[in-house]
Amino acid sequence: MSTYLIGDIHGCYDELKIILAQVRFDPAVDTLWLTGDLVARGTGSLEVLRLVRSLGDSVQLVLGNHDLHLLAVYAGISRNKPKDRITPLLEAPDADELINWLRRQPVLQVDEEKKLVMAHAGITPQWDLATARQCAREVEAVLKSDSYPLFLDAMYGDMPNNWSPELSGLARLRFSTNVFTRMRYCFPNGQLEMNCKDTPEKASTPLRPWFALPGPVSERYSIVFGHWASLMGQGTPAHIYGLDTGCCWGGELTLLRWEDKAFTRVPSNRQNETSVENPISA
Protein backbone atom coordinates (compact mmCIF):
# COMPACT_ATOMS: atom_id res chain seq x y z
CA MET A 1 0.00 0.00 0.00
CA SER A 2 1.55 3.25 -1.17
CA THR A 3 0.43 6.86 -1.36
CA TYR A 4 1.47 8.55 -4.59
CA LEU A 5 1.20 12.29 -5.20
CA ILE A 6 1.34 13.69 -8.74
CA GLY A 7 1.72 17.31 -9.81
CA ASP A 8 -0.35 19.21 -12.37
CA ILE A 9 -1.30 16.95 -15.28
CA HIS A 10 -2.82 19.57 -17.60
CA GLY A 11 -4.17 17.06 -20.09
CA CYS A 12 -0.88 15.15 -20.43
CA TYR A 13 -2.58 11.77 -20.63
CA ASP A 14 0.29 9.76 -22.10
CA GLU A 15 2.71 10.89 -19.41
CA LEU A 16 0.16 10.09 -16.71
CA LYS A 17 -0.28 6.56 -18.02
CA ILE A 18 3.49 6.06 -18.20
CA ILE A 19 4.18 7.29 -14.67
CA LEU A 20 1.42 5.15 -13.16
CA ALA A 21 2.79 2.12 -14.99
CA GLN A 22 6.34 2.85 -13.83
CA VAL A 23 5.34 2.73 -10.16
CA ARG A 24 2.89 -0.12 -10.77
CA PHE A 25 0.02 1.85 -9.29
CA ASP A 26 -2.75 -0.49 -8.12
CA PRO A 27 -6.05 1.24 -7.32
CA ALA A 28 -7.08 -1.75 -5.22
CA VAL A 29 -4.40 -1.06 -2.61
CA ASP A 30 -2.70 2.26 -3.44
CA THR A 31 -3.90 5.85 -3.09
CA LEU A 32 -3.31 8.58 -5.68
CA TRP A 33 -3.27 12.25 -4.69
CA LEU A 34 -3.48 14.82 -7.51
CA THR A 35 -2.62 18.50 -7.06
CA GLY A 36 -5.28 19.76 -9.50
CA ASP A 37 -5.24 21.33 -12.96
CA LEU A 38 -6.11 18.00 -14.50
CA VAL A 39 -7.11 19.74 -17.71
CA ALA A 40 -6.05 22.35 -20.29
CA ARG A 41 -2.89 22.98 -22.33
CA GLY A 42 -2.20 19.31 -23.08
CA THR A 43 -4.13 17.42 -25.75
CA GLY A 44 -5.62 14.71 -23.53
CA SER A 45 -7.87 16.51 -21.04
CA LEU A 46 -10.85 14.30 -21.91
CA GLU A 47 -8.85 11.11 -21.46
CA VAL A 48 -7.33 12.34 -18.19
CA LEU A 49 -10.74 13.05 -16.67
CA ARG A 50 -12.10 9.69 -17.80
CA LEU A 51 -9.12 7.86 -16.33
CA VAL A 52 -9.09 9.72 -13.02
CA ARG A 53 -12.84 9.28 -12.59
CA SER A 54 -12.54 5.56 -13.34
CA LEU A 55 -10.11 5.13 -10.44
CA GLY A 56 -12.88 5.87 -7.96
CA ASP A 57 -12.08 6.08 -4.28
CA SER A 58 -8.38 5.41 -4.83
CA VAL A 59 -8.02 9.04 -5.95
CA GLN A 60 -7.82 12.06 -3.66
CA LEU A 61 -7.67 15.23 -5.75
CA VAL A 62 -8.11 18.95 -5.40
CA LEU A 63 -9.44 21.37 -7.98
CA GLY A 64 -7.09 23.85 -9.64
CA ASN A 65 -7.76 27.15 -11.37
CA HIS A 66 -7.87 25.50 -14.79
CA ASP A 67 -10.39 22.96 -13.56
CA LEU A 68 -12.60 25.78 -12.29
CA HIS A 69 -12.16 27.62 -15.58
CA LEU A 70 -13.32 24.51 -17.44
CA LEU A 71 -16.48 24.49 -15.31
CA ALA A 72 -17.04 28.15 -16.18
CA VAL A 73 -16.55 27.50 -19.90
CA TYR A 74 -18.97 24.58 -19.85
CA ALA A 75 -21.52 26.73 -18.01
CA GLY A 76 -21.26 29.38 -20.76
CA ILE A 77 -19.66 31.92 -18.44
CA SER A 78 -16.13 32.01 -19.85
CA ARG A 79 -14.72 31.72 -23.36
CA ASN A 80 -13.19 28.53 -24.70
CA LYS A 81 -9.62 29.47 -25.58
CA PRO A 82 -8.02 27.38 -28.36
CA LYS A 83 -4.72 27.23 -26.44
CA ASP A 84 -6.45 25.23 -23.69
CA ARG A 85 -7.27 22.39 -26.11
CA ILE A 86 -10.43 21.40 -24.23
CA THR A 87 -12.87 21.36 -27.18
CA PRO A 88 -12.88 17.52 -27.42
CA LEU A 89 -13.86 17.41 -23.75
CA LEU A 90 -16.58 20.01 -24.14
CA GLU A 91 -18.06 18.11 -27.10
CA ALA A 92 -17.71 14.59 -25.65
CA PRO A 93 -20.88 12.50 -25.23
CA ASP A 94 -20.06 12.05 -21.53
CA ALA A 95 -19.18 15.70 -20.95
CA ASP A 96 -22.16 16.27 -18.63
CA GLU A 97 -21.16 13.33 -16.44
CA LEU A 98 -17.52 14.40 -16.29
CA ILE A 99 -18.31 18.04 -15.52
CA ASN A 100 -20.82 17.15 -12.80
CA TRP A 101 -18.28 14.77 -11.27
CA LEU A 102 -15.55 17.42 -11.43
CA ARG A 103 -17.55 20.13 -9.70
CA ARG A 104 -18.14 17.81 -6.78
CA GLN A 105 -14.43 17.45 -6.06
CA PRO A 106 -12.77 19.23 -3.11
CA VAL A 107 -10.33 22.12 -2.99
CA LEU A 108 -8.53 20.83 0.12
CA GLN A 109 -7.31 17.42 1.24
CA VAL A 110 -6.09 16.65 4.76
CA ASP A 111 -4.66 13.40 6.14
CA GLU A 112 -4.31 13.76 9.90
CA GLU A 113 -2.44 10.48 10.29
CA LYS A 114 0.20 11.54 7.78
CA LYS A 115 0.06 15.18 8.90
CA LEU A 116 -0.36 16.03 5.23
CA VAL A 117 -2.31 18.87 3.61
CA MET A 118 -2.81 19.38 -0.13
CA ALA A 119 -4.22 22.36 -2.03
CA HIS A 120 -3.58 23.33 -5.63
CA ALA A 121 -1.87 26.67 -4.91
CA GLY A 122 -1.18 26.31 -1.20
CA ILE A 123 -2.43 27.57 2.16
CA THR A 124 -2.25 31.21 3.18
CA PRO A 125 -0.17 31.80 6.33
CA GLN A 126 -3.12 33.83 7.62
CA TRP A 127 -5.18 30.66 8.16
CA ASP A 128 -5.06 27.91 10.73
CA LEU A 129 -6.27 24.49 9.60
CA ALA A 130 -9.75 24.92 11.05
CA THR A 131 -10.21 28.10 9.01
CA ALA A 132 -8.83 26.45 5.87
CA ARG A 133 -11.25 23.57 6.29
CA GLN A 134 -14.20 25.88 6.85
CA CYS A 135 -13.37 28.01 3.81
CA ALA A 136 -12.89 24.88 1.70
CA ARG A 137 -16.29 23.54 2.79
CA GLU A 138 -17.91 26.81 1.75
CA VAL A 139 -16.39 26.74 -1.75
CA GLU A 140 -17.18 23.06 -2.18
CA ALA A 141 -20.78 23.53 -1.05
CA VAL A 142 -21.51 26.24 -3.59
CA LEU A 143 -19.87 24.24 -6.39
CA LYS A 144 -22.16 21.32 -5.59
CA SER A 145 -25.25 23.52 -5.41
CA ASP A 146 -27.64 24.60 -8.15
CA SER A 147 -26.32 28.15 -7.82
CA TYR A 148 -22.77 27.20 -8.85
CA PRO A 149 -22.92 29.27 -12.10
CA LEU A 150 -23.35 32.44 -10.01
CA PHE A 151 -20.20 31.57 -8.08
CA LEU A 152 -18.24 30.74 -11.24
CA ASP A 153 -19.22 34.09 -12.73
CA ALA A 154 -18.09 35.94 -9.59
CA MET A 155 -14.88 34.02 -8.81
CA TYR A 156 -12.68 35.97 -11.24
CA GLY A 157 -10.88 38.89 -9.62
CA ASP A 158 -8.04 39.69 -7.24
CA MET A 159 -10.00 41.40 -4.47
CA PRO A 160 -10.37 41.08 -1.57
CA ASN A 161 -6.73 40.18 -1.06
CA ASN A 162 -6.54 40.19 2.73
CA TRP A 163 -8.19 37.71 5.07
CA SER A 164 -10.72 38.75 7.64
CA PRO A 165 -13.16 36.48 9.48
CA GLU A 166 -15.72 39.17 8.70
CA LEU A 167 -15.58 38.48 4.96
CA SER A 168 -18.87 37.08 3.69
CA GLY A 169 -20.75 36.14 0.56
CA LEU A 170 -19.07 36.15 -2.82
CA ALA A 171 -16.14 38.23 -1.56
CA ARG A 172 -15.28 35.54 0.97
CA LEU A 173 -15.68 32.79 -1.63
CA ARG A 174 -13.44 34.66 -4.08
CA PHE A 175 -10.70 35.14 -1.49
CA SER A 176 -10.82 31.46 -0.56
CA THR A 177 -10.77 30.38 -4.20
CA ASN A 178 -7.75 32.57 -4.87
CA VAL A 179 -5.91 31.05 -1.91
CA PHE A 180 -6.67 27.47 -2.87
CA THR A 181 -6.17 27.78 -6.63
CA ARG A 182 -4.26 30.95 -7.68
CA MET A 183 -1.98 32.22 -4.90
CA ARG A 184 1.79 32.50 -5.30
CA TYR A 185 3.04 35.57 -3.44
CA CYS A 186 2.16 37.42 -0.26
CA PHE A 187 3.26 40.63 1.37
CA PRO A 188 4.99 40.15 4.74
CA ASN A 189 1.66 40.56 6.55
CA GLY A 190 0.15 37.69 4.55
CA GLN A 191 -1.88 39.88 2.18
CA LEU A 192 -2.11 38.27 -1.26
CA GLU A 193 -0.35 39.69 -4.32
CA MET A 194 -2.02 38.10 -7.32
CA ASN A 195 -0.10 39.53 -10.29
CA CYS A 196 3.50 38.37 -9.90
CA LYS A 197 4.34 35.04 -11.55
CA ASP A 198 8.13 35.37 -11.48
CA THR A 199 10.41 32.94 -9.72
CA PRO A 200 11.31 34.08 -6.18
CA GLU A 201 14.76 35.35 -7.15
CA LYS A 202 13.14 37.71 -9.69
CA ALA A 203 10.23 38.88 -7.56
CA SER A 204 10.25 42.44 -6.31
CA THR A 205 10.74 43.34 -2.66
CA PRO A 206 8.85 42.90 -0.34
CA LEU A 207 6.97 40.01 -1.95
CA ARG A 208 7.49 36.56 -0.45
CA PRO A 209 6.33 33.15 -1.66
CA TRP A 210 3.41 32.07 0.51
CA PHE A 211 5.46 29.12 1.77
CA ALA A 212 8.29 31.40 2.95
CA LEU A 213 6.06 32.99 5.59
CA PRO A 214 5.44 31.10 8.85
CA GLY A 215 1.88 30.02 9.45
CA PRO A 216 -0.12 27.74 11.73
CA VAL A 217 -0.62 25.06 9.07
CA SER A 218 2.97 24.87 7.81
CA GLU A 219 4.22 24.71 11.39
CA ARG A 220 2.36 21.43 12.04
CA TYR A 221 1.80 19.80 8.65
CA SER A 222 3.57 18.93 5.46
CA ILE A 223 1.99 20.75 2.51
CA VAL A 224 1.82 19.53 -1.08
CA PHE A 225 0.84 21.93 -3.86
CA GLY A 226 1.05 22.39 -7.62
CA HIS A 227 0.25 25.47 -9.72
CA TRP A 228 3.72 27.07 -9.77
CA ALA A 229 5.54 25.41 -12.67
CA SER A 230 8.43 27.87 -12.80
CA LEU A 231 9.63 26.64 -9.39
CA MET A 232 10.30 23.23 -10.95
CA GLY A 233 9.92 21.73 -7.48
CA GLN A 234 12.78 23.78 -6.02
CA GLY A 235 13.17 26.40 -3.30
CA THR A 236 10.57 25.28 -0.77
CA PRO A 237 11.13 24.27 2.86
CA ALA A 238 11.90 20.58 3.32
CA HIS A 239 8.36 19.69 4.42
CA ILE A 240 6.61 21.61 1.62
CA TYR A 241 6.51 19.99 -1.81
CA GLY A 242 5.79 21.81 -5.07
CA LEU A 243 5.00 19.09 -7.59
CA ASP A 244 4.13 21.08 -10.71
CA THR A 245 7.17 20.67 -12.96
CA GLY A 246 5.67 21.97 -16.18
CA CYS A 247 4.78 18.79 -18.03
CA CYS A 248 2.46 20.66 -20.39
CA TRP A 249 5.28 23.13 -21.13
CA GLY A 250 7.87 20.54 -22.08
CA GLY A 251 9.09 19.84 -18.55
CA GLU A 252 8.26 16.72 -16.58
CA LEU A 253 5.40 15.01 -14.80
CA THR A 254 6.50 14.45 -11.20
CA LEU A 255 5.31 11.78 -8.75
CA LEU A 256 6.20 11.58 -5.06
CA ARG A 257 5.81 8.36 -3.09
CA TRP A 258 4.95 9.57 0.37
CA GLU A 259 6.22 6.64 2.41
CA ASP A 260 9.88 7.09 1.47
CA LYS A 261 9.74 10.50 -0.28
CA ALA A 262 11.02 8.91 -3.51
CA PHE A 263 10.45 10.86 -6.73
CA THR A 264 9.61 9.50 -10.17
CA ARG A 265 9.73 11.81 -13.17
CA VAL A 266 8.54 11.31 -16.74
CA PRO A 267 9.69 13.74 -19.45
CA SER A 268 6.99 15.59 -21.34
CA ASN A 269 6.34 14.51 -24.89
CA ARG A 270 5.93 18.22 -25.72
CA GLN A 271 9.62 19.04 -25.90
CA ASN A 272 9.13 21.81 -28.46
CA GLU A 273 6.73 24.01 -26.50
CA THR A 274 7.80 27.56 -27.37
CA SER A 275 4.82 29.65 -26.24
CA VAL A 276 5.73 33.05 -24.83
CA GLU A 277 3.61 32.04 -21.83
CA ASN A 278 5.90 29.11 -21.04
CA PRO A 279 6.86 29.60 -17.36
CA ILE A 280 9.77 27.15 -17.43
CA SER A 281 11.55 28.48 -20.53
CA ALA A 282 12.99 31.63 -18.97
Curated annotation (Swiss-Prot):
Family annotation (InterPro entries): ApaH, Calcineurin-like_PHP_ApaH, Metallo-depent_PP-like
Protein's name in the database: Bis(5'-nucleosyl)-tetraphosphatase, symmetrical
Pfam families xref list: Metallophos (PF00149)
Enzyme Commission number(s) of this protein: 3.6.1.41
GN (gene name): apaH
Family: Belongs to the Ap4A hydrolase family.
Keywords: Hydrolase
Species of the source: Sodalis glossinidius (strain morsitans)
Reaction equation(s) it catalyzes: P(1),P(4)-bis(5'-adenosyl) tetraphosphate + H2O = 2 ADP + 2 H(+)
CDD domains: MPP_ApaH
Gene3D superfamilies in alphabetical order: 3.60.21.10
